[in-house]
Design a protein with these regions (language model features):
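FIC/Doc superfamily catalytic core
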Residues: 1-251
Length: 251
């Protein structure tokens, strides 16, 4: 039985006792980092912000097996932030799309996350309407015309199903519930909100592709919202990339 098949879905539960110590330790480290950054001058903070965003974009794509040119990513971010870094490198459409999504998520964290905004992010990720060679539904919820949305591995004919997402007909309702919670998650630790948002979004898997990258952008948005700053000085995706095997095992 998958998590979304339980009667109490989507009422997610967790062990407060086990999590509280970990969350407290991470929060302390966050505070120390942000405190140190406050003591630096604007140029150094801006460069750290640029480096963090570049790493976040590159590593989030790497998690999915996609390789982006880091120079293109850095140049695209710098241009959008109005930073003069010299040696501007032209970025392709795929890079521009991922950068656009990440900057919108972290830079406009105070704006409401709704379905249209998610559609815009998804369209930015797939500007050609294709994922690799395969044509996909872009800027709208997936359908089940080719069967249920499944995460599989193995050779053709010997596939192993790791996960099956909720039926496509449930997507409007499932996403509406998620967005309502995300707009008012209550008095929870910001790190817990980011983690729950990520898990919830990849569980419903509303798009034909790109769900992982969008889920991580949502988590980054939750963290930026909690810190009340557009500047990022640590990368969630970089850490996940370092622990990718464990990440997929947990999912």
């Amino acid at each position: 039985m998958y998590i979304w098949e339980h009667d109490n879905w989507p009422a997610l539960r967790w062990d407060d006792e086990k999590l509280s110590r970990v969350l407290a330790r991470v929060s302390r480290e966050q505070g120390r980092l942000l405190g140190k950054m406050e003591g630096l001058g604007f140029p150094l903070r801006s460069e750290a912000h640029l480096q963090t965003l570049t790493e976040d974009v590159v590593k989030s794509s790497e998690i999915e097996g996609a390789k982006l040119d880091s120079a293109q990513v850095r140049s695209s971010i710098a241009r959008r932030l109005g930073m003069d870094v010299g040696g501007v490198v032209a970025a392709d459409r795929e890079v521009e799309g991922v950068v656009e999504m990440m900057l919108d998520a972290t830079g406009n964290y105070a704006q409401t996350l709704d379905a249209e905004r998610l559609f815009g992010w998804h369209a930015a990720l797939f500007p050609t309407g294709r994922s690799g060679m395969r044509k996909i539904i872009v800027g709208d919820w997936r359908d089940d015309k080719e069967g249920p949305m499944r995460v599989v591995s193995g050779a053709i004919g010997k596939e192993r199903v790791h996960y099956e997402a909720p039926p496509a007909k449930r997507m409007p309702d499932e996403v509406e519930k998620f967005l309502a919670w995300f707009s008012a998650p209550g008095d929870l630790d910001p790190l817990l909100i980011a983690g729950l948002a990520h898990l919830w979004f990849v569980t419903i898997h509303p798009f034909e592709d790109g769900n992982g990258r969008i889920a991580r952008a949502i988590a980054d948005m939750a963290l930026a919202r909690a810190e009340q700053t557009q500047q990022r000085f640590y990368s969630l995706s970089a850490q996940i990339r370092r622990e990718r095997d464990e990440y997929y095992t947990v999912l």
